[in-house]
């Protein structure tokens, strides 16, 4: 599963990489880096993925990093079936596919299906509204191939814990069109789409937003 975050590596990087670190402690690796003249790397601060945010509270994380953000953006519209159904706390605090924490009573489950940053609008819909078969990938990086074969079939993961779904890929320069064989849920622009052939990591890229400025599934 950890290969999901490695799609951006090149063959040049992989050729110089030793796996795994095994029984070495991180402190020992830092000492090794210093001994080889990479003191600036050894002293770098820890890096954390967003999944390490305390209590998974990205709203508190954003408010801490950008003081006044919520006050600046609160009061935008929740839109459901072209009607305004409530007010939200600011579009950055919501993600495609989100159901919990919306703080709006609709009488039935609703999900974030689209986000319009320019208008500070968050669009809501039913679970079926999240389903789609198509996405585009930008900043394509390939590890296994120099160029994707024609009508290439791969297992595509669109989030870290996603088991993946089969799709047909068509490469266009540094982009790719991905057509899933069955609809998948909550395709979110900005997330990584990662391609596998069996257990082999083929490559990946970032899910591109649609031509519209509205970010949707």
Name each region found by the language model.
Residues 1-217:
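Nucleotide-activated chemistry modules centered on ATP-dependent adenylation/adenylyltransferase
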